[in-house]
Amino acid sequence: MAETTSDLFEKAVRLHSRRLLAIARAIVGSAAAEDVLQQAILNLYQHRQRYDWTQPAGLMRRTVVNEALRLLRQPRMSLVADDHPGRADSPVRGMIDDEMIQQVRKAIARLPEHFRAALVLCEYENMSYVQIAEVLDASVPQVKTWLHRGRRQLAEKLKAFADERKLKDAK
């Protein structure tokens, strides 16, 4: 018996939801990630008859990214860093690691949305330029530009943190 569209949709959601949540979390932060995922799944469900659910990963990623970017465009949206305990050898090292992670997250959060989305998909999802271009509805050269500029801006933002850290350590 052939699987129905609804069966394939449910299977796709079960199979991909953890990865999609990670993408949403990387783009909008943990506070809004579940909302982004739920809205993306709802949008897909409402239009499930339109799509081929035999290979849904790309469609689902693109929908989550689009929903995350839509949410970021809303003026009241602010990013919140995750509060995961650090895994360090000592409490002091753990505090330093947590501070660094928090600064990286803040720096990523301050990037323009397309730079942030491209970086997340490239660095966290290990997607190719072609895949990122498909998800973000852009050309491959545009994706390369976003990645280059995003990395450069991220490095500049983190350099300020590193310089500040050196001053604190020198005291």
Ranges and model annotations:
Residues 48-63, 140, 145:
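Short, aromatic/basic-enriched loop-to-helix "N-cap" motif that marks the start
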Residues 65, 69, 136-162:
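DNA-recognition helix of helix-turn-helix
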Residues 17, 21, 41, 112, ...:
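C-terminal flanking helix
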Residues 1-11, 21-39, 47-55, 164:
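Short, charged helix-capping/linker segments at alpha-helix termini
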Residues 118-122:
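A short pre-motif secondary-structure segment
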Residues 62-82, 97, 160-161:
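Arg/Lys-rich amphipathic alpha helix in sigma70-family domain 2
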Residues 20, 24, 33-44, 60-63, ...:
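Short, small-hydrophobic-rich alpha-helical interface motif
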Residues 7, 78, 83-109:
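Acidic, proline/glycine-rich intrinsically disordered inter-domain spacer in sigma factors
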